[in-house]
């Protein structure tokens, strides 16, 4: 398949009036036909496609193209293109597009060399839909930067105001946190809000399972 054919197929797939029938839908044909195109070339075609569609009316097109980019990264992770995807979070302002992008990123395993600053910024967004999605997506990166972005929310003490942020942050820290995070999480183990309490307790348990050699060092004095 030539680049021109590929872009035409993208045009069909991202069109608002695209065909829905599974066997004939552009989305289905997209994943069947491009096998003859090198994956490295696919990435650059997608990036160019996104960067050249900057108008407001192109929002839907970019959103669908991000879905394709996310699927391709899931199939063949390339740090350079993963970085491009994350950096694009700063270029979009539609909360539904950002939510969709974050959903794609959350399914990836972000390489350690990728800068997640734009993802961290989204985790403090004024838009709750974006903020909540971003906090959960931080779990895709096992980096200190990601952990610190999650700790920002776990350190909050107003559990009523930041209930959902704490629930999501506790859960994520359970998967990417280190032994030193146990004491931070234990601040919420006796929360009056059940979901905050349960996610904190589960996170502590999960970290201890992953770092058993350090678990005793993190045992609170009251537990001795």
What are these regions (language model features)?
Residues 1-11, 36-53, 75-90, 110-124, ...:
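Amphipathic alpha-helical scaffolding segments comprising HEAT/armadillo-like alpha-solenoid repeats
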Residues 1-29:
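N-terminal "cap/leader" segments of large eukaryotic alpha-helical scaffolds
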Residues 14, 52-54, 59, 65, ...:
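Residue-identity detector for threonine
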């Amino acid at each position: 398949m030539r680049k021109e054919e590929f872009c035409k197929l993208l045009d069909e797939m991202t069109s608002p009036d695209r065909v829905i029938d599974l066997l004939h839908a552009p989305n289905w044909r997209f994943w069947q036909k491009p096998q003859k195109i090198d994956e490295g070339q696919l990435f650059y075609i997608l990036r160019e496609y996104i960067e050249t569609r900057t108008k407001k009316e192109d929002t839907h097109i970019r959103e669908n193209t991000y879905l394709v980019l996310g699927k391709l990264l899931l199939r063949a992770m390339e740090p350079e293109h993963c970085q491009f995807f994350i950096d694009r979070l700063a270029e979009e302002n539609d909360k539904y597009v950002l939510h969709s992008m974050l959903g794609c990123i959350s399914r990836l395993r972000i390489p350690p060399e990728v800068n997640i600053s734009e993802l961290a910024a989204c985790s403090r967004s004024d838009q709750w839909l974006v903020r909540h999605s971003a906090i959960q997506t931080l779990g895709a990166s096992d980096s200190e930067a990601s952990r610190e972005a999650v700790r920002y929310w776990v350190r909050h003490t107003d559990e009523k105001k930041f209930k959902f942020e704490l629930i999501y942050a506790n859960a994520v820290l359970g998967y990417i946190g280190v032994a030193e995070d146990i004491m931070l999480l234990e601040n919420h183990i006796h929360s009056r809000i059940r979901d905050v309490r349960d996610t904190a307790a589960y996170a502590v348990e999960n970290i201890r399972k992953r770092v058993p050699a350090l678990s005793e060092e993190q045992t609170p004095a009251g537990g001795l």
